[in-house]
Amino acid sequence: MITDVDGVLVGHWTDADARTGCTVVRFPEGTVASAEVRGGAPASRELELLAPHRTVSRIDAVVLSGGSAFGLAAADGVMAELEAEGIGFPTAFGVVPIVEGLSLFDLGVGDPTGRPGPVEGRAACRAVAGGAHAVGAVGAGTGATVGKWRGREHATDGGIGASSVRDGEVIVAALIAVNAAGDIDDGSATADPVDLGSLRPSEEAFHDDGSPEMTNTTIGVVATNARLDKNGCLVVAQGGHDGMARALFPPHTTADGDALVAAATQQVDADLDLVRALALIAVERAIRGLGGGLGRR
């Protein structure tokens, strides 16, 4: 789990009736982060701040939420909670918490008016803890589904997946909210030639105006105890997306808003290519741990 990285904490807020929620990942002081978006329809907050050429290097928390772009408001509650704790980027006029937001589209699954907001984000932030955390239909993964590109009748549950891998002292871990248009590829089948007809989404997956019937997005956080700068964290986020591409078929579609934040807590020296490779494995395992769908293609 991502909490295997020392100092990383996770909290969930879940509305099982509305089938939505949010998940907060908090980091220890001094954590550096960057991010990468590969999906065509992202809903995000403050990601540009994590670009390597931007000034601020620190990160305090990431909020993963349902509710599509409405759910980004959950980060307001997390900022308020961290400000009350005195955590954030110091200025002459008080601290400004560095909180990134990523949201997935679950409005068509439960109650579309029940999306997370500031109160729910603050509740998830107050619930953070180390050690084992809940996975599956919880937090941002409560209303998550997969397999929708072949039509609504093929949709199955997604959710929150988690994994961690080690190489000596180096730990890389992932927490992923899986709400993909594509299927979870369990990797069990042999690499047979792809049937090109199977690559065409079902007409039932779209409304008459061409818009998707159920929309999507897989979002998450990769954390490592390695000492990395923002450029290194960007490379790790890219490795995480490679893991997403191994575990989902098809990945990164125009109807997905796939995005990952990669955070480094600066505790041990590590080779960047090793950390990137471990990120690939961690994300792949986190997604596949939610259950199989397709065999590998």
Describe the predicted segments one by one.
Residues M1-A69, A73, A80, A84-R297:
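A structural signal for small-residue-enriched, beta-sheet-centric alpha/beta enzyme cores
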